[in-house]
Amino acid sequence: MSSYYVDGLLSKYTAGSSLFPNVERASCSIGPSGEDYGSARTTAAIAFAPSLSGVYSVSDAVYQSRPVFTSGYGQGQDAHTLHCSLFDQSRLFTDSCCHPEPGPLTSPPDKQYRMYPWMRASDPTRKRGRQTYSRYQTLELEKEFHFNRYLTRRRRIEIAHALCLSERQIKIWFQNRRMKWKKDHKEEPVSTPSGEKDCDIQPVSEAEEPKAVNNPERRFGVRNG
């Protein structure tokens, strides 16, 4: 490297006290409008352009376009206003969703809930349906009634589990069966022994009864002689 080139380069660097003599320290605080940061950035760009043009031989036209970047900072107030407006809009939308306007107490007929039969209140005057038992269940209950007309609680639980019925159903069935049994036996006539007939039984008259009492021999079978 020639000494002429080195001396010429050093003379350019030593011409000023610093490479960026007019650059000011930018403030870190951003005001509500954002203009402080934009003005500091604009000043730094203007001071930075002539210093570099002497070293790197860059035309000033390139650095004249630097303020394009500062135009965004100059609109800081509008940007903040736009951001706040979007936030306010979202907040208003959220409030309107969370706090709907009071409407009528009665909903339209097409939006009413569907009522199922099991959701309605039971009518006390309505009669319940009669419980039907299968043939196998009836046969087992009849067999149990033939041996025991009254069941203990333990036996009732066993039969209920065996026949897949409830204790209440077993209890009601036995109550009805006992009432039927009493009714059938109450209406049956008293049967007489098979060897006797109604015609063989003759009523004793009052005229013949004193003769048997007054004649002791005939009464006890005593014969004379």
Curated annotation (Swiss-Prot):
A motif (Antp-type hexapeptide) lies at residues 115-120. GO terms for molecular function: DNA-binding transcription factor activity, RNA polymerase II-specific; RNA polymerase II cis-regulatory region sequence-specific DNA binding. Pfam families: Homeodomain. Residues 183-225 are annotated as: Disordered. The keyword Nucleus applies. SMART domains: HOX. Keywords: Developmental protein, DNA-binding, Homeobox, Nucleus, Transcription, Transcription regulation. One of its GO terms (cellular component) is nucleus. InterPro entries: Antp_homeobox (IPR050296), HD (IPR001356), HD_metazoa (IPR020479), Homeobox_antennapedia (IPR017995), Homeobox_Antennapedia_CS (IPR001827), Homeobox_CS (IPR017970), Homeodomain-like_sf (IPR009057). The keyword Aminoacyl-tRNA synthetase does not apply. It is found in: Nucleus. Residues 126-185 bind DNA. One of its GO terms (biological process) is anterior/posterior pattern specification. PROSITE patterns: ANTENNAPEDIA (PS00032), HOMEOBOX_1 (PS00027), HOMEOBOX_2 (PS50071). Residues 184-200, 208-225 have a biased composition (Basic and acidic residues). Its main location: nucleus. Belongs to the Antp homeobox family. Sequence-specific transcription factor which is part of a developmental regulatory system that provides cells with specific positional identities on the anterior-posterior axis. This is Homeobox protein Hox-A7. It comes from Morone saxatilis (Striped bass).
